[in-house]
A protein has these predicted regions:
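Residue-level recognition of pore/gate-forming positions within transmembrane alpha-helices
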Residues: 11-15, 89, 160-164, 225-226
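Long, glycine/tryptophan/cysteine-rich extracytoplasmic
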Residues: 184-201
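Junction motif at the cytosolic side of a transmembrane helix
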Residues: 219-241
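Transmembrane helix segments
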Residues: 20, 152-189
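Secretory targeting signals
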Residues: 3-56, 82-150, 170, 174-177, ...
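Membrane-helix interface/capping residues of multi-pass secondary transporters
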Residues: 2-4, 78, 152, 241
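Transmembrane helix boundary and interhelical loop/hinge segments in multi-pass membrane proteins
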Residues: 52-74, 78-79, 86
């Protein structure tokens, strides 16, 4: 319970706090090419770590304390218990992220709604909602990794590597001509880039190659998360606690 409050509180504080600060520091003309929800992205890039940590702790903390035995004794259907955890976590994470991003977006729209900001439509709000769902998927992936690893620190380390290492690894691979193709692929398909694209902050591409579509970024994470969740069901059903 305490970890839930701290992680969700950190998420809200980062997204809303950093976002409102960014809104104040921008001018109306800055939003001619940016969506009103763009300032929320600055805090969300760090706040997504709070979602990842909460996803891991939702399942791994019970393994660490031994409470998972009590849980499975009270509710012998392990798959139903795991499903309930996924649903509750996913709902809470999505609502918290969406409300935080929406608050910052509305704040920006109120302060910078003049003609200098240019036209804005529902598409940018839909993109922000997709970005919030993207972060929620990262949390669900973290929860699946926590169920597989059963160790909080190890699962968090794995997820931090998944989120932060691809841009670094891709840049290193781009140095050598032999691996530049792989490096460009890694730089185009990773969590930070996907989040930026969904929020409508476009990139110019890597090495002359066009960036993948928003749907491609979302589909990749959906497939990876689905595979990890499926593996977690198989492992939790067969493995002793």
């Amino acid at each position: 319970m305490r970890s839930t409050l701290w992680t969700l509180g950190s998420l809200v504080a980062l997204v809303v706090g950093v976002g409102m600060l960014a809104v104040v520091q921008t001018a109306s003309q800055d939003y001619e090419k940016l969506p009103y929800t763009a300032p929320a992205l600055f805090g969300l890039m760090v706040g997504q770590i709070a979602v990842i940590v909460l996803g891991v702790l939702t399942i791994s903390s019970e393994y660490g304390t031994g409470l998972i035995r009590t849980t499975f004794t009270a509710a012998p259907d392990r798959l139903r218990v795991l499903t309930a955890k996924y649903l509750v976590f996913g709902t809470v994470a999505l609502l918290t992220t969406t409300l935080s991003v929406g608050f910052v977006g509305l704040w920006a729209a109120i302060l910078h709604s003049g003609p200098a900001a240019g036209p804005h439509g529902l598409a940018e709000w839909a993109g922000a909602l997709a970005g919030c769902f993207y972060v929620t998927l990262l949390g669900l992936l973290a929860m699946a990794v926590g169920a597989l690893v059963r160790h909080s620190a190890g699962a968090i380390a794995v997820m931090l590597g998944v989120v932060t290492m691809p841009p670094v690894l891709g840049s290193i691979l781009m140095v050598w001509p032999v691996t530049s193709g792989v490096g460009g692929l890694v730089l185009r398909y990773n969590a930070p880039v996907g989040l930026f694209q969904l929020f409508g902050v476009q990139d110019n591409g890597v090495g002359g190659a066009a960036m993948p579509s928003d749907l491609a970024q979302m589909t990749l994470l959906v497939l990876v998360t689905a595979a990890a969740v499926t593996a977690s069901y198989a492992v939790v059903r067969r493995r002793d606690v």
